[in-house]
Amino acid sequence: MKKKVLALVLAGSMLAMTACGSSSDSDAEEETEEETEETEEESTEETEEETSEETSEEEESEEETAASDESFTIGICQLVQHDALDAATEGFIDTVTEYYGDNVTIDEQNAQNDTATCSTIVTGFVSNNYDLILANATPALQAAVAATSDIPILGTSVTDYATALDLDDFDGTTGMNVSGTSDLAPLDQQEDMILELCPDVEKVAVVYCSSEANSVYQADVIEGYLDEDGVAWAEFTFADSNDMQSVINSAVAECDVIYIPTDNTAASNMTIVSNITEPLGIPVFCGEENMTSVGGLATLSISYYDIGVAAGEMAIDILSNGTDVSTIPIGYAEEVTKEYNAEYAEAIGMEMPDDYVPIETDDEE
């Protein structure tokens, strides 16, 4: 009997041990399976991440290759050669060539201050199906607009686009194949400058070329500000450089201060002005720096190079990003500076305030 009981006890113990062994083996197998699954999941995630990174790198590489394959031809029509327009063209060319390198071809032409030549130049650009046209100065812009409604046109050194393009409802964009940058410095501040430096002024001569739309616009605005301040003024206009001397002589005979807006004809012939006004001690206020450096006293200046750079950035946006030129707002200079011609100021005995900066000449540079 004792032997049977002992046998049963031993059998029960062995069964219990077997059950424990089976349970341990099962747990171990489950842990191994879980570890395997986790390893497989981690491996799959890493593979997916690597694949995604490789795909992204490939896409970036393809984009860079596409960008490097871009090739464009840009036509530049500049109305006339003088320092302000030259600086705007230089800023534009520097910007697009830095971006595109050898993948941009620039056809730069100067119209020698002839509107008919502007038309001939831009017609050639259109016939050659250039990718973009830069029109430097208002007559160049008007000629380009007359020549094409398809090729993107950017203007620079254009004072007022609404006037230049005869736009009735101008909201900052032209709504046509045109955008660009303006060389307009605040006209109210220019009039303030006249009164600041010449508080006893009796009469201001407003002198400009009657065939330049932007000059007409600026003259009208300045005359309005002078009226508001009760300052007398008279208008003196010339058709071209041939009658500038007689017009300036008439102006100094009647007025004690001269104002000349940004005017391409005047800008190319400022020595005619200074040869008459400087010996008489008459202050001449100009619409921009380069005119002042040759034959004026003071100006509220912008950087023409900078507005050329801004136009270049617009060109890149149009050509490489496909931006619609008609939706790009006209750009304006972000900063203006009170500047003066130190030699002219000394010649007429004018002491300048401390917040006016002398214009650097080639000798000073």
Feature map (PLM): residue ranges:
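Sec-dependent N-terminal signal peptides of Gram-positive bacterial secreted proteins and lipoproteins
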Residues: 2-23
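Bacterial lipoprotein signal-peptidase II cleavage site
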Residues: 19-32, 37-48, 57
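Hydrophobic alpha-helical segments within soluble ligand-binding/sensing domains
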Residues: 67-69, 161-203, 302-323
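Extracytoplasmic "Venus flytrap"
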Residues: 67-94, 99-101, 107-117, 211, ...
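An alpha-beta-alpha
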Residues: 74, 92, 179-226, 324, ...
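Beta-alpha junction/loop-to-helix N-cap segments that form part of ligand/metal-binding clefts
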Residues: 108-168, 260-278, 282-287
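Pocket-lining segment of extracytoplasmic ligand-binding domains
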Residues: 213-282, 288
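Hinge/cleft segment of the Venus flytrap/periplasmic-binding protein
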Residues: 317-365
